[in-house]
């Protein structure tokens, strides 16, 4: 019985040892798996942490670059608006300059036509001067004939005067009177010289206004012809008078008184004829001088006109260049508008991409929070599983301790019973049967107790197996959750790569926009230069207008003074006309014509001077435009400095935003570090439990 019991106890011990060995092997296997899984999780978490740190750094960099690009785009838009305003102003100024250029061209055309008219009038006046010379030659020939006739008559009269002393005395008195008349003639010749000087001026003026006064010149020619006729009539009358004198000389004794009166009349007529001849000679000389002066003046005027035409051609070429530059500026403005539209579209796309990136980041943050919550739930479930495992391990240890105690008790009891049996064998061999009965009963009791203990231990083993299965299931669930987290992390990494790629595209687009902005800035500088030139031209044109107004006022005053002088001269000529006969009337008419021509010549001279002043002013306008270009460069530099200051302000705002985002990211990192610490603590506890 003892052997059977020992064998059964050995079997039970073997079973318990096998179960204990199996449980230890399974626990060791599970610990190894759990440690490997925890190590993998730790490596993955470290890699994820590193990747997250890198992604955070790159995210910060890209956000900073994106904000800088947005600031640059805003500044570019502002500069574009200012450039468009400046372009509109330049277009307006260029339009005004074109109008002024057209007016200048019209004035130039008028001056050229006026020059042609003056040249035509000069040629006509030269022809008229030649005709007057021919007429003077004819008059001189007539004068010589008349002088010869007078000499003949004088010879006759001298013969008669020898006979008649009284007539000589009377002739002497007549000579005295003639000398006085010569003095008067000298005075009148001086007045005539002054008149001829005025006539020279008038002829110069007539060179510019001949086309208007051709009819008057023809009338003057008709009057000259009438004067010739009158002179011929007078000459015929003189001849008749001479014949009468000859007849009277034959009858001097009879008609003494008549001869004296006729001689006096003849002397007066002679004096008039000589005076008229001298006046005509002086007039011819003066006309020749006037003609030479007019030729010189015409040559000077032609030289000035040629210079003015050359300068006008240069100015027209410069104006054409300016128009070409204006067309270039207009094309550049259109290009700027198109590029601005492209930039606005790119900016809208970049903003939409940034909004999408922010939305995705927000979704990722929500997913991270959800994963953290799931991780917290898993950690709580893991803690509960650990507590259950610890409880089961404590139960197992208690059962092992109880089994050891029971085995020790049974061994003690068996030893005691063996001793008692041996004592009973030695002492009471009689009581063997009783002891056998008791042993049988004890064996039955032991069997029942062993069966009960076996069942109890089997139930405990099944419970332990169930707890191990539950722990394995929990471990499998943890591995699944870890795999899910790894998949989510891979998805986040892919999403991060996409965001990084989009940010790289945005950076490339920003580089393109920066280059476009630089090109736009260069074009803006050119437009500003053109605008400043136009403004300067406008100011100079206004100054020229004011100067022209002042010049017109001065010319009006000069015209008033000339009118007063004209009235004085007319009064003087009227006095002379009252003194003189038909010849003086003709001179008065010619003087009036000369005065008109002088006024017209002065007006033409003033026009030429104004033309020269306009050309000088155009040169000053050109210089002022160059100065405006320089000032435009300075203004553009100032505008760029202001734009940079505005960009710096926007960058400061964006940096403050980036700092806020960085603070939020650091808080998220801190939370993530805390969760990592909690996971590490849990892993450490799991390892400790597995080691136990």
UniProtKB/Swiss-Prot annotation:
Which compartments does it reside in?
Cytoplasm, Myofibril
Q: Which GO terms describe its cellular component?
A: myofibril; myosin complex; myosin filament
Transmembrane parts of this sequence: none
Please give the residue ranges the record annotates as the region Disordered.
26-57
Region Nonhelical region: start and end of each range? Answer: 1-15
Q: InterPro entries, per this entry?
A: Myosin_tail, XRCC4-like_C
**What keywords tag this UniProt record?**
Allergen, Coiled coil, Cytoplasm, Motor protein, Muscle protein, Myosin, Thick filament
On subunit structure and binding partners, the annotation says: Homodimer.
Q: What does this protein do?
A: Paramyosin is a major structural component of many thick filaments isolated from invertebrate muscles.
- State the protein's name: Paramyosin
Organism of origin is Dermatophagoides farinae (American house dust mite)
């Amino acid at each position: 019985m003892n052997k059977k019991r020992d064998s059964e106890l050995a079997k039970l011990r073997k079973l318990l040892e096998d179960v204990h060995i199996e449980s230890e092997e399974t626990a060791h296997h599970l610990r190894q798996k759990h440690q490997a899984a925890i190590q993998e999780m730790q490596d993955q978490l470290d890699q994820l942490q590193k990747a997250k740190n890198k992604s955070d750094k790159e995210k910060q960099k890209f956000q900073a670059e994106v904000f800088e690009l947005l600031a640059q785009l805003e500044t570019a838009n502002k500069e574009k608006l200012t450039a468009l305003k400046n372009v509109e102003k330049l277009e307006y100024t260029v339009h005004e300059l074109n109008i002024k250029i057209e007016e200048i061209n019209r004035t130039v055309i008028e001056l050229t036509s006026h020059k042609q008219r003056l040249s035509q009038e000069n040629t006509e006046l030269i022809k008229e001067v030649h005709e007057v010379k021919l007429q003077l030659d004819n008059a001189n020939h007539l004068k010589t004939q008349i002088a010869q006739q007078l000499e003949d008559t004088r010879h006759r009269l001298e013969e008669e005067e020898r006979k008649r002393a009284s007539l000589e005395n009377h002739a002497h008195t007549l000579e005295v009177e003639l000398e006085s008349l010569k003095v008067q003639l000298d005075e009148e010749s001086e007045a005539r010289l002054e008149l001829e000087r005025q006539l020279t001026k008038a002829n110069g003026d007539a060179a510019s206004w001949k086309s208007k006064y051709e009819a008057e010149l023809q009338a003057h020619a008709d009057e000259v012809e009438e004067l010739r006729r009158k002179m011929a009539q007078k000459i015929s009358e003189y001849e008749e008078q001479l014949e009468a004198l000859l007849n009277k000389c034959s009858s001097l004794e009879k008609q003494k008184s008549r001869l004296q009166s006729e001689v006096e009349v003849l002397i007066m007529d002679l004096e008039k004829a000589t005076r008229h001849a001298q006046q005509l000679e002086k007039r011819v000389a003066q006309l020749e001088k006037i003609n030479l002066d007019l030729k010189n003046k015409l040559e000077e005027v032609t030289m000035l006109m040629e210079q003015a035409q050359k300068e006008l051609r240069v100015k027209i070429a410069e104006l054409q260049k300016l128009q070409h530059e204006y067309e270039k500026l207009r094309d550049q403005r259109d290009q700027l508008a198109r590029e601005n539209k492209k930039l606005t579209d790119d900016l809208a796309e970049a903003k939409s991409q940034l909004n999408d990136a922010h939305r995705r980041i927000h979704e990722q943050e929500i997913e991270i929070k959800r994963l953290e919550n799931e991780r917290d739930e898993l950690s709580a479930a893991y803690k509960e599983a650990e507590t259950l495992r610890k409880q089961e391990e404590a139960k197992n240890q208690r059962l092992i301790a109880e089994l050891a105690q029971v085995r020790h008790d049974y061994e003690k009891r068996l030893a005691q019973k063996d001793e008692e049996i041996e004592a009973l064998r030695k002492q009471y061999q009689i009581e063997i049967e009783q002891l056998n009965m008791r042993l049988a009963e004890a064996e039955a009791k032991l069997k029942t107790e062993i069966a009960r203990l076996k069942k109890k231990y089997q139930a405990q083993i099944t419970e332990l197996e169930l707890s191990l299965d539950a722990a394995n299931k929990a471990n499998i669930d943890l591995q699944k959750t870890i795999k899910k987290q790894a998949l989510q992390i891979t998805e986040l990494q892919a999403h991060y790569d996409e965001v990084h790629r989009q940010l790289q595209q945005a950076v490339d687009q920003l580089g393109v926009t920066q280059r476009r902005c630089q090109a736009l800035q260069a074009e803006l500088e050119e437009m500003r230069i053109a605008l400043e030139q136009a403004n300067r031209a406008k100011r100079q044109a206004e100054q020229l207008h004011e100067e022209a107004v002042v010049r017109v006022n001065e010319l009006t005053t000069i015209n008033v003074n000339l009118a007063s002088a004209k009235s004085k001269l007319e009064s003087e000529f009227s006095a002379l006309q009252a003194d003189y006969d038909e010849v003086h009337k003709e001179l008065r008419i010619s003087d009036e014509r000369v005065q008109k021509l002088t006024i017209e010549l002065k007006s033409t001279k003033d026009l030429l001077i104004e033309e020269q002043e306009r050309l000088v002013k155009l040169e000053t306008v050109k210089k002022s435009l160059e100065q405006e270009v320089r000032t435009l460069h300075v203004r553009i530099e100032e505008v760029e400095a202001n734009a940079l200051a505005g960009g710096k302000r926007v960058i400061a705002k964006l940096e403050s935003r980036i700092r806020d985002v960085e603070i939020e990211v650091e808080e998220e990192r801190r939370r993530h570090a805390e969760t990592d610490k909690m996971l590490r603590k849990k892993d450490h506890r799991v390892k400790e439990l597995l080691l136990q």
